């Protein structure tokens, strides 16, 4: 297959391989001759499109023609512009159905925590309350790993450094504290050492007071200014924590007990054709078995938000989604930035033309499920089903937000490729087989097989098998590469 018309209403098709000028394309019993070279992932017109008329992809407008576009012409940023404006008015027009029957739930081997949560890793985490102690925390980590043969018997000891925790006010201070508190409670961590300096805004005492119930044998706190030798004190804390969690064992559980974040980064023109629809099918499978998934990257919902709104389970959920979308648009406006200048240079090089084009592909990850809840940044997941989470499109911030909400894994589709990993296993799904072959050390799964003849049901089954392996302890590429990062959303001033 060299090209695809995604929806019956489309007036463009997408090249699935590089197509040369003069290539004859047959679609709907009509033959179109390409008037220019069209790269893989890029679009070409199937019919003449008049100046000002809509360019249709996924059955919906992705922009309008800047000039007359003849059949066979390359359709991209040079001749197409977004239709989108600033704040919009929305109506609740529910349009959803029950999910069809899905394959049976799968057994996985997981860690059961005392509070009822489950984890897919048993790691010892070091969390600085403030960036000033990152170096101290690194020394503590390195010394401890040498003393314990790399924390034998666990899935590792990891430091998640950041630059925040002081000189912050308002929402930024709250976001930093909340993200770190969510990490303390994350079930992939068998134990946590929180390290403060002593004079920062993000005070350890206030952090503990607002943290809620914790197991004091598995969560320790240390303030460096109160220690004679903070390195030795920190190492002693880690030994105590290690001795508590090192004997934790996996137990049988169900895949539907896990929470999955859905994300894309470095998207291309195949993202909405291969990897994202597959993730949508996986999300439906998990949810049909009683599980939980969550979609974020709010700026990459712009242009497709009405589709998600129509899937909200009730008007209250719809209103929460409207507020989330318009609040994020207002965030752009308040900083005097254009709302719809989203597609990156890499997106455009891969064939994505407008934000509508990007968003309609991005939201394929949501599948056909009903939206059960809309969460603010820093909120934790509480309702099984498809959730939406407020966070930006930035890969690092969005991945951290998903993990902070309680996701055990983040499922991350990419067409251009990225090595990035968050603080939970970050499963990279390539939209095209060329990327999967070139970057085997980055990519965990090849969804590009769809355009080379593999049927979606078979691909989905193989993907479920892969996720079960990762849940059972097999390392993702980001884990093997030790690419584990934390990024916290910042929107305000720095003192």
Curated annotation (Swiss-Prot):
CDD domains: SAF_AH_GD. The keyword Lyase applies. Its EC number is 4.2.1.7. It comes from the Bacteria. GO terms for biological process: D-galacturonate catabolic process. Gene3D superfamilies: 2.30.130.110. Induction: Repressed by LeuO and H-NS. Part of the uxaCA operon. Pathway: Carbohydrate metabolism; pentose and glucuronate interconversion. GO terms for molecular function: altronate dehydratase activity; ferrous iron binding. It catalyses: D-altronate = 2-dehydro-3-deoxy-D-gluconate + H2O. Keywords: Iron, Lyase, Manganese. Optimum pH is about 7.5. The activity at pH 6.5 and 8.6 is only about 20% of the maximal achievable activity at optimum pH. Is inhibited by high concentrations of Fe(2+) (> 2 mM), and by EDTA or other iron chelators in vitro. Pfam families: GD_AH_C (PF20629), GD_AH_second (PF04295), SAF (PF08666). Mn(2+) can substitute for iron, but in higher concentrations. Cannot use Fe(3+), Ni(2+) or Mg(2+). Its cofactor is Fe(2+); Mn(2+). Belongs to the UxaA family. Catalyzes the dehydration of D-altronate. This is Altronate dehydratase. The lineage of its organism: Bacteria, Pseudomonadati, Pseudomonadota, Gammaproteobacteria, Enterobacterales.
């Amino acid at each position: 297959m060299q090209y695809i018309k995604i929806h019956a209403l489309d007036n463009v098709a997408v090249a699935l391989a590089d197509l040369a000028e003069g290539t004859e394309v047959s679609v709907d019993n009509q033959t179109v001759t390409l008037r220019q070279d069209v790269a893989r992932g890029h679009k070409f017109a199937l019919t003449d499109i008049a100046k000002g008329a809509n360019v249709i992809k996924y059955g919906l407008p992705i922009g309008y023609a800047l000039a007359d576009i003849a059949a066979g012409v390359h359709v991209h940023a040079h001749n197409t512009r977004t239709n989108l404006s600033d704040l919009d008015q929305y109506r609740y027009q529910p349009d959803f159905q029950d999910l069809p029957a899905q394959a049976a739930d799968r057994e996985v081997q997981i860690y059961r925590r005392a509070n009822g949560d489950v984890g897919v890793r048993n790691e010892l985490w070091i969390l600085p309350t403030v960036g000033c102690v990152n170096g101290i925390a690194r020394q503590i980590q390195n010394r401890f790993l040498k003393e314990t043969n790399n924390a034998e018997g666990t899935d590792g000891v990891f430091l998640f450094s950041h630059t925040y925790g002081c000189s912050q006010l308002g929402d930024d201070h709250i976001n930093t504290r909340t993200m770190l508190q969510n990490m303390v409670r994350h079930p992939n961590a068998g134990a946590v050492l929180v390290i403060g300096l002593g004079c920062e805004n993000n005070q350890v005492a206030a952090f503990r007071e607002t943290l809620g119930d914790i197991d004091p044998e598995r969560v320790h706190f240390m303030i460096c200014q109160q220690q004679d030798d903070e390195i030795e004190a920190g190492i002693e804390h880690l030994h105590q924590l290690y001795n508590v969690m090192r004997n934790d064992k996996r137990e049988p559980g169900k895949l539907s007990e896990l929470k999955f974040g859905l994300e894309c980064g470095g998207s291309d023109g195949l993202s909405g054709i291969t990897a994202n629809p597959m993730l949508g099918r996986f999300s439906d499978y998990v949810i049909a078995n009683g599980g939980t998934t969550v979609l974020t990257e709010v700026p990459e919902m712009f242009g497709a938000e009405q589709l998600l709104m129509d899937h909200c389970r009730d008007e209250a959920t719809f209103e929460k989604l409207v507020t989330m979308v318009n609040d994020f648009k207002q965030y752009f406006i308040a900083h005097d930035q254009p709302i719809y200048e989203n597609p990156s240079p890499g997106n455009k090089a891969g064939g994505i033309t407008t934000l509508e084009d990007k968003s309609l592909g991005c939201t394929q990850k949501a599948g056909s499920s009903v939206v059960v809840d809309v969460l603010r940044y820093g909120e934790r997941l509480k309702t099984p089903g498809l959730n939406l989470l407020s966070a930006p499109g930035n890969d690092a911030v969005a991945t951290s937000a998903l993990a902070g909400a309680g996701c055990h894994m983040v499922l991350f589709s990419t067409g251009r490729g990225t090595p990035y990993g968050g603080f939970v296993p970050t499963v990279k799904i390539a939209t095209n087989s060329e990327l999967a072959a070139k970057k085997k050390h980055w990519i965990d799964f090849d969804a590009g097989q769809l355009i080379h003849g593999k049927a979606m049901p078979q691909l989905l089954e193989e993907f479920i098998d892969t996720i079960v392996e990762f849940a059972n302890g097999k390392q993702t590429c980001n884990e093997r590469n030790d690419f584990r990062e934390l990024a916290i959303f910042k929107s305000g001033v720095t003192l």
